[in-house]
Amino acid sequence: MRATLTRAVTFSAAHRYRRPEWDDARNREVFGACAHLNWHGHTYTCEVTVGGEVDPVTGFCADLGALDRALAERVVAALDHRNLVLDVPAFAEGALIPTGENVAWWIAREVQAALGPSTRVERVRLSEMPGLWVEIVPA
């Protein structure tokens, strides 16, 4: 039997959307207020769902302690109270634009790397504010 387990964490971070090869006018046209040169921030809520076969001995589908450590060490420690563009190499200017989709994908990759192959990241849901979220399902 397979099951899933979801844990939610929060973190606060600043970012902006910008393509360095575009001028300011083009960035504003495409990204709107998210392209503001002086940044903007969110208090994100991130839900990570992992899944696996239920262990007949423990009754667990995943090691919650390992998931909590992965979220604390690979996500919250890396992103909380950070400027995503300046502090996280994956989102440096000219690399990935720190959209909700890209941040969620990055989180999925980081958590999966920490958990190893026995537990699979099934879904990441990332909310920038009430009423706005992105959900990714890693392939």
Please name every model-derived segment.
Residues 1-139:
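Charge-rich, low-complexity N-terminal segments
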